[in-house]
Swiss-Prot record:
One of its GO terms (biological process) is L-leucine biosynthetic process. This is 3-isopropylmalate dehydratase large subunit. Keywords: 4Fe-4S, Amino-acid biosynthesis, Branched-chain amino acid biosynthesis, Iron, Iron-sulfur, Leucine biosynthesis, Lyase, Metal-binding. It comes from Listeria monocytogenes serovar 1/2a (strain ATCC BAA-679 / EGD-e). It catalyses: (2R,3S)-3-isopropylmalate = (2S)-2-isopropylmalate. Pathway: Amino-acid biosynthesis; L-leucine biosynthesis; L-leucine from 3-methyl-2-oxobutanoate: step 2/4. Heterodimer of LeuC and LeuD. Its EC number is 4.2.1.33. CDD domains: IPMI (cd01583). Belongs to the aconitase/IPM isomerase family. LeuC type 1 subfamily.
Length: 462
């Protein structure tokens, strides 16, 4: 029987262990940031251990970065964590994309942008959205602080092999429907736990026609569907994205020859298989307190089916039967490791250009990295957003999570391009609605959600 992409990647990295038991995997790339690394570095010091492979470790600042003034850190814990990463990287010889550096940004954007993220690798990070890197034909998953220390010390990690799931996505995306809507649809349809215990491979005509940025959006939110990791087979789109980047292989022809073998064999079988038709999708909006609680734009919010729904409606200040258009928005956030890449900002700018943010809305655009910010400014996107009334910020995780000054006030509804809508995720009492960048941009200039498919300047589809 043939092998799946996941099988091939996993088998390449097993150092020790029997099938059905935890196995020791070699780690090709360890990405770190300021929040989950201090304890791990301190553990090395206490045991007087060196960091085994500083050349396979890369650090950046993202979670705690103040995006209005990156060097004005008021929170003492955040300041201490950032200073600790600077000290630790200097002491242990780790390359750091520091505050203000041209390489600084959200860790899951910096890896791909620098060419560190490549097909065939096992990539770990002390952050759950490490699944993003699977878009390159890699294994990427988040780890805890004790596991970060283990990787520091050994460049390996113990893991139980997940089962395999194949999600086949075919059909042309309709105008106004994006990669974000695909993953929101999957989670709304199958639930936040459907991927538990699985490594998910997304494939099919729709995936093949996507850019790397779109692919990263889908893999980024594999974790929201419960999966251990998400991945896609590498192809010419992947190879051209990696080519010429700072850490790309010196012999690209040789690398590509190997990467082309990273495909699921025609006679391979997944443990679970799902088929999806992308051509019938609509823009999605979440109404509740987990990503499963979402609906196509044309549908009303569902009836209460259990205590979780009842609690979600109470927290969100909404009722069954209402529609997305009726949500009283106060904030719009375009950013996060899900949707803060250049193509996301370009699509949002197309909608915003020549319009003004409504008076009831405070709108932020936070590029996911310094590279994206510089590229956006080089083509004038910053001016479009600023003239429309958006705040144009420095790169960082920003309003995706309530760990920095960018937070949504208590009881306020926010249209957000991020990945999680849990209670308090964007600040105490914040009410988060997950959408695509186009939907968020349109909400900002209309003062509420609208059917993005009726906007003339949008693209979407593939």
């Amino acid at each position: 029987m043939g092998k799946t992409l996941f099988d091939k990647l996993w088998n390449r990295h097993v150092i020790y262990g029997k099938e059905g038991e935890p196995q020791l995997l070699y780690v090709d790339l360890h990405l770190i940031h300021e929040v989950t690394s201090p304890q791990a570095f301190e553990g090395l010091r206490l045991e007087n251990r060196p960091l085994r492979r500083p050349d396979k470790t890369f650090a950046t600042m993202d979670h705690n970065v103040p995006t209005e003034d990156i060097f004005n850190i008021q929170d003492l814990v955040a300041k201490k964590q950032i200073e600790a990463l600077q000290t630790n990287c200097a002491e242990f010889g780790v390359t750091l994309a520091d505050m203000g550096s041209d390489r600084q940004g959200i860790v899951h954007m910096v890896g791909p942008e620098t060419g560190l993220t490549q097909p065939g690798k096992v990539i770990v990070c002390g952050d759950s959205h490490t699944a993003t890197h699977g878009a390159f034909g890699a294994i990427g998953f988040g780890i805890g602080s004790s596991e970060v220390e283990h990787v520091f010390a050994t460049q390996t990690i113990w893991q139980q092999k997940p089962k395999s799931m194949g999600i086949e996505i075919n059909g042309k995306l309709p105008k106004g429907v994006y990669a974000k809507d695909i993953i929101l649809h999957l989670i709304a349809t199958y639930g936040v736990a459907f991927g538990t215990g699985y490594a998910v491979e997304y494939y099919g005509e729709t995936i093949r026609n996507m850019s790397m940025e779109e692919r990263m959006t889908i893999c980024n939110m594999a974790i929201e569907g419960g999966a251990k990791m998400g991945m896609m087979a590498p192809d010419e789109t992947t190879f051209e994205y990696v080519r010429g980047r700072e850490y790309a292989p010196t012999d690209m022809d040789k690398a590509i020859s190997d990467w082309k073998t990273l495909q699921t064999d025609s006679d391979a079988e997944y443990d679970l298989h799902i088929k999806m038709d992308a051509s019938i999708l609509e823009p999605y909006v979440t109404w509740g307190t987990n990503p499963e609680m979402g609906v196509p734009f044309s549908k009303a919010f569902p009836e209460i089916k259990d205590m979780n729904y009842e609690r979600a409606y109470e927290y969100m200040g909404l009722k069954p039967g209402q529609t997305a258009e009726q949500i009283e928005l106060g904030y719009v956030f375009i950013g996060s490791c899900t949707n803060a890449r250049l193509s996301d900002l370009e699509e949002a700018a197309r909608i915003v250009k020549g319009n003004k943010v409504k008076n009831n809305i405070r709108a932020l655009v936070v590029p996911g990295s310094r590279q994206v910010r510089n590229a956006a400014e080089s083509i004038g996107l910053d001016k479009i957003f600023i003239e429309a009334g958006f705040e144009w910020r420095e790169p960082g995780c920003s309003m995706c999570l309530g760990m920095n000054p960018d937070q949504v006030p208590d009881g306020v509804h926010c249209a957000s391009t991020s990945n999680r809508n849990f209670e308090g995720r964007q600040g105490k009492g914040a009410r988060t609605h997950l959408v695509s960048p186009a939907m968020a941009a349109a909400a900002a200039i209309n003062g509420h959600f609208i059917d993005i498919r009726k906007v003339a300047v949008i693209s979407g589809g593939n």
